[in-house]
A protein has these predicted regions:
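Mid/C-terminal beta-alpha module of Rossmann-like enzyme folds, strongest
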Residues: 225-244
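NAD(P)-dependent short-chain dehydrogenase/reductase
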Residues: 148, 159, 171-223, 227
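Rossmann-fold scaffold of SDR-type NAD(P)-dependent oxidoreductases
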Residues: 6, 93-98, 136-137, 239
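Conserved internal alpha-helix within the Rossmann fold of NAD(P)-dependent oxidoreductases
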Residues: 121-125, 170, 226
Length: 244
């Protein structure tokens, strides 16, 4: 199968490239550089937007190196661009759309980039490849906040640019597409708020090491789920997590 993966150098995308590249012909669209807002900046609560410190830079570089090695030799063509800017003039059997801002907290500081990367990116894909089914990575943030267990019929609503953009993007998907709403994916290659980076930061300032408890799914299990979806394609919208 010929598969285009947007955001193929990102956390989720790189793991998908590594796994699917063993069986399928993979192309990557990814415009990443070190000026990417999620790589360069961090939100520090009341302090607002700041550039990453030395510890955060170290972990981002380590995880970038991990992802680069993860995709090496597993794809056919790499197109260094964003999906809302340019797309390859080729035909594909499937598109997996991972290419967008992944740091929801930063959407308040970069609303235009949030909309472009999430909404305009998918608009471009749907216009450029109208007959190709899309596996779209959305987010549980389309639900806003909730208590208890929810299903896919739970009402949508969000108070931030990220969640609202994800809701808008979902409306662009059609009857042949699959939408996934993961709650939190963790694992190697995640350079944002990885558990080991948070531990490193707490130790550096002599504070207790605290690990937040939340519903989540390990990246390898998420990839397995996507492979099963591809093998048994059933269009629709699905929540995905361990405790969802």
């Amino acid at each position: 199968m010929r598969i285009l993966i947007t955001g193929g150098l990102g956390f989720i995308g790189s793991h998908l490239v590594n796994s699917l590249g063993k069986q399928h012909v993979i192309d990557i669209v990814d415009g990443f550089d070190e000026n990417y807002v999620g790589y360069k900046f961090i939100h520090r609560g009341s302090k607002g937007l700041q550039e990453t410190n030395d510890i955060e830079k170290k972990h981002r570089k380590l995880n970038l190196h991990y992802r680069v090695n993860k995709v090496r030799g597993m794809y056919r063509h790499f197109f260094k661009t964003n999906s809302y800017v340019q797309l390859p003039l080729k035909e594909y059997d499937l598109i997996i759309n991972c290419g967008a801002l992944s740091e929801a907290i930063l959407s308040q500081h970069f609303p235009e980039f949030t909309h472009d990367s999430i909404v305009k990116g998918l608009e471009s894909l749907k216009k450029f490849y109208p007959k190709t089914p899309v596996l779209h990575i959305s987010s549980s943030m389309v639900y806003g906040t909730w208590e208890g267990v929810i299903d896919e019929q739970y009402s949508l609503g969000s108070e931030n640019h990220y969640g609202l953009s994800k809701i808008k993007a979902e409306t662009l998907c059609g009857e042949k597409d699959v939408i996934l709403r993961p709650i939190h994916i963790y694992g190697m290659g995640d350079g944002k708020f990885s558990i080991w980076m948070n531990i490193d930061r707490q130790i550096a300032i002599s504070k207790p090491v605290l690990v937040e408890r939340a519903g989540c799914i390990y990246i390898d299990d998420f990839v397995i789920a996507i492979k099963k979806i591809i093998d048994s394609w059933n269009p629709g919208t699905y929540n995905i997590s361990y405790n969802f």
